[in-house]
Every structure is written in structure tokens, then in C-alpha cells.
């Protein structure tokens, strides 16, 4: 979509958020990153035959489920689903933070 962003307020009310770094190094050259990117691109291309979308992020979970059969390759379907669901999870997380619903945020 875009590189636009917004800040979401956090009211913890005694809750704590733990942020960790596994320190695991990833190489985009030797990893399967390029394969996953190509599979995601194929999922988008297939979905565009039945949906008027520019990115996988244009779909809701429900829209993806309604049109997922347009993605012929099972692995590409899995990659597309991951992209759509993670985007929706982020949207839900921001909504939960704006509503001071730290419990829902934590479950996401």
C-alpha cells in the first residue's frame, strides 16, 4: 500500500510488554526469502484475476478466504494467506491499542 504510518497510544495499566531480539542472523541472498517473495507475488497475480486489488494488503481475511481458490499453487496460497492475515492482525492491534484493550492486543 504505502509507507504511511501512525502512532498508536499505549495505556498499559500495569501490564508489561517484553520486546526481544533472538540475534539470529538472516541472509536475504542465501535464505529462501526470494522464493517466498516470488510465491507471494504469484498469489497476488492469481488473486488479481478475480479481485480488483493492487496488493495483498488490500484484502481482509474474509475476502481472502472467499477468493483463495484462484491461487492454484498451494505454497503460493499459503504465502498469500500469511501476508493478508498478518496485515489484518496489525490493523486489529492498532485498533486494540486505540481502545486501550491491552488484553486483546496481547492475544494478537
Where are these regions (language model features)?
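C-terminal nucleotide
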Residues: 1-108
